[in-house]
Amino acid sequence: MSTMRLLTLALLFSCSVARAACDPKIVNIGAVLSTRKHEQMFREAVNQANKRHGSWKIQLNATSVTHKPNAIQMALSVCEDLISSQVYAILVSHPPTPNDHFTPTPVSYTAGFYRIPVLGLTTRMSIYSDKSIHLSFLRTVPPYSHQSSVWFEMMRVYSWNHIILLVSDDHEGRAAQKRLETLLEERESKAEKVLQFDPGTKNVTALLMEAKELEARVIILSASEDDAATVYRAAAMLNMTGSGYVWLVGEREISGNALRYAPDGILGLQLINGKNESAHISDAVGVVAQAVHELLEKENITDPPRGCVGNTNIWKTGPLFKRVLMSSKYADGVTGRVEFNEDGDRKFANYSIMNLQNRKLVQVGIYNGTHVIPNDRKIIWPGGETEKPRGYQMSTRLKIVTIHQEPFVYVKPTLSDGTCKEEFTVNGDPVKKVICTGPNDTSPGSPRHTVPQCCYGFCIDLLIKLARTMNFTYEVHLVADGKFGTQERVNNSNKKEWNGMMGELLSGQADMIVAPLTINNERAQYIEFSKPFKYQGLTILVKKEIPRSTLDSFMQPFQSTLWLLVGLSVHVVAVMLYLLDRFSPFGRFKVNSEEEEEDALTLSSAMWFSWGVLLNSGIGEGAPRSFSARILGMVWAGFAMIIVASYTANLAAFLVLDRPEERITGINDPRLRNPSDKFIYATVKQSSVDIYFRRQVELSTMYRHMEKHNYESAAEAIQAVRDNKLHAFIWDSAVLEFEASQKCDLVTTGELFFRSGFGIGMRKDSPWKQNVSLSILKSHENGFMEDLDKTWVRYQECDSRSNAPATLTFENMAGVFMLVAGGIVAGIFLIFIEIAYKRHKDARRKQMQLAFAAVNVWRKNLQDRKSGRAEPDPKKKATFRAITSTLASSFKRRRSSKDTSTGGGRGALQNQKDTVLPRRAIEREEGQLQLCSRHRES
């Protein structure tokens, strides 16, 4: 006991010595409250905070005033009663008068000027979130615009994708619109229509009539009480509060005068403890107390200003204290967890979801700060319905956009009477055509006039089928700019917008795209695709290289070197056969001794044998006789068989099964991967193919080359290939294969790449997307898509490439006929040479015979004279005279021919040793004839 007394005395002594060190720091907290009762609650909350924190270093002190009737008095009261007391923060509630919305404003302006934090208790106007106006304002309640988060969550829970946003054109309405649109963008969606009206307007009928024409049946309303009442009255007159409609509103729209006219079934929101000023006082004091203790632990803390004295009295620590307050997390609040966002607004607020039933508000769910938890069994929807409305009406008149792309969509002009010409398909069925409006010319720079035209093809048949199945009508128009759709910058800014069919769909000019629109990720981020109605990929179109048959086509199976070797082999083998048979002792033989020996194999016969074996023409005579030569003959026959068989096989490959050589092998062809100006290839500008090449890093080199040569449309590019202005065109395989089957000078080459499909495009919130996909799947199952494919895509006018033998034409075999003609000409030429040679040889033989006959007669006469006969026989003398006369005249003709042929020099006979007798022989014969003549005369 004595020890305790000593400690107490020591403590009292130390405090008396250093009193300042023992006294707690007084922290004043100001408040502007609605009533004296709330001032008492404020003081009690401060005392509770002192007890809760239990720190002897800090003592919170409450300083409060009530609301003043006008803004000037309120500002003066803040300066004289609160700031003069060096308050660290000021709490302010909403004034009790409903129409006085701006009472917190003078408090916020005055305290904010000196950087003193202000905590709003029940103020929910969105203007206080603007920190350029209210620098130091925080609040323990969320603004009205935060109700958009609850609406957005309810849309997600009930799968409502079609909404109409009806807002007043004031700060509150614009804030709600901005927040909801931001949330919808994160979900890649948007409101079907945003309708604004001026605050205080008394007539919104025209606006609601516009809303009634839309598909959406979920209406979100943000307006004041009086404006909401005006909207409710007009909606009831237009029958927009009955079955099928959904009304989502906030707290103001089901309060006061608005509740009197609100339709049964409406769903509204009420902030839990939103008007419980005492609860918010307790939570605000707790947040400030927690922040003060955290602030005073820091260094260089200055005291708040003492009074409103110019701009030199700004609290330097005020911004720091505000940041400490905004980062506070007060978990044990009466109204729940208290936290602030970057604008100083309350986060994680809890709402009650209220349903108006029989003119009474019934709670049918809650929002716990992150999720909506509804009680669907308790909800009564407009019109007394108990089933959740689907939130949209199915429009029976759809705007269809398409594009000219054969064979999917053909476009032809109408007849003079505005109708379409009757045509028939390959199956004999009439072609189904629809009237479509669109520009008569989509080429760049040309004047465009929207005119009615006739559309038909694969996609039109599909559209007619879908309309019949899903019970809707349609109006078709061609895309204005002739493009499928890609994103492009607007006025060289960073903002991008879609053009083509994509742009028309997203802007609301069309409800559906029925065209060969390629499904890709970039487009799927903005629109909804149906299941593919046609699977395909990308391929390459080139001009077909038609082979030109030359006269030497029959020689193509062998190279020139091989032909030379075969020809050389024929003659070498012939010479070897001749030599072997010549030198063999068995080259000539006879069957028995009585027969004469057979002739040996001559060089001519050997040559004939060699060629005959090679050409399989049969050997009638001149076969080798010796065993060695016959061995060579058999080997040569085997060689000839192999050569002929190889030639025949290759000849069939070159002439019968010949196909045009494809110019490129596919996307990995070196001419594509390593582009040059000698080989130009391209695709269509701003198409899915263009996007594909632009997005692929490994194809960047190809894209840079293609970008300079891309065409406006596929039809232009295909014609450029046919005109040899473009070497290769990369496009959808379904289109290019059809073009190749219709235009026989074109061919597709290479394997498919970038496999994808064609789908029907709809907006993200389209009510038709599920039904369209189901209808397409059923069409695949029942064979309808296969029938369309056969009718429009796979129909071929050109012969398809196959492995069946092709028919030979004269061009293929012209060289063979020329070879025969050459043989005939050579034979005729040689026969004349043979005739001339034969005549020359016969004349020479006759001359020799006459000469020998004359010599024989002379010898006979000489022998007779020697034997004693005086006179020769007169007949013999006459014969001898005739022979010598003929022989002499013959020699004279030869000599004169020789003289005329030798002109001024040596004659041709001197250069031809085998055509005339030697000069000496002629002179010797002439001498003998002269001797015979003299002897006869003697």
Swiss-Prot record:
Question: How might one describe the regulation of this protein's activity?
Answer: NMDA glutamate receptor activity is inhbited by Mg2(+) in a voltage-dependent manner; Mg2(+)-induced blockade occurs only at negative potentials and decreases with membrane depolarization. 7-chlorokynurenate (50 uM) or Zn2(+) (100 uM) partially inhibit the NMDA glutamate receptor activity, while acide 2-amino-5-phosphonovalerique(100 uM) almost completely blocked the NMDA glutamate receptor activity. Dizocilpine (1 uM) results in long lasting and almost complete block of the NMDA glutamate receptor activity.
An annotated GO cellular component? synapse
Q: Where are the transmembrane segments?
A: 560-580, 628-648, 812-835
Give this protein's Gene Ontology molecular function annotations: amyloid-beta binding; calcium ion binding; calmodulin binding; glutamate binding; glutamate-gated calcium ion channel activity; glycine binding; glycine-gated cation channel activity; ligand-gated sodium channel activity
Q: Could you say what the effect of mutating N650I is? A: In NDHMSD; likely pathogenic; changed glutamate-gated calcium ion channel activity; mutant channels are activated at 100-fold lower glutamate concentrations and 30-fold lower glycine concentrations
Q: Which residues are glycosylated?
A: N61, N203, N239, N276, N300, N350, N368, N440, N471, N491, N674, N771
Q: Which SUPFAM superfamilies match?
A: Periplasmic binding protein-like I, Periplasmic binding protein-like II, Voltage-gated potassium channels
Membrane-topology annotation of the record: Multi-pass membrane protein
Q: Where in the cell is it found?
A: Cell membrane; Postsynaptic cell membrane; Postsynaptic density membrane; Synaptic cell membrane
Q: What is the effect of changing L655Q?
A: In NDHMSD; likely pathogenic; changed glutamate-gated calcium ion channel activity; mutant channels are activated at 10-fold lower glutamate concentrations and 13-fold lower glycine concentrations
In the UniProt record, the signal sequence range is 1-18
Q: Where is this region: Disordered?
A: 889-938
Q: In the UniProt annotation, what is the result of changing G827R?
A: In NDHMSD; loss of function in calcium ion transmembrane import into cytosol
Instruction: Tell me a GO biological process for this protein.
Output: ionotropic glutamate receptor signaling pathway
The condition associated with this protein in its record is: Neurodevelopmental disorder with or without hyperkinetic movements and seizures, autosomal dominant: An autosomal dominant neurodevelopmental disorder characterized by severe intellectual disability and developmental delay, absent speech, muscular hypotonia, dyskinesia, and hyperkinetic movements. Cortical blindness, cerebral atrophy, and seizures are present in some patients. Neurodevelopmental disorder with or without hyperkinetic movements and seizures, autosomal recessive: An autosomal recessive neurodevelopmental disorder characterized by severe intellectual disability and psychomotor developmental delay, involuntary and stereotypic movements, spasticity, and inability to walk without support. Intractable seizures manifest in some patients.
- The identity of this protein, by name, is Glutamate receptor ionotropic, NMDA 1
Q: Which organism is it from?
A: Homo sapiens
Which gene name belongs to this protein?
GRIN1
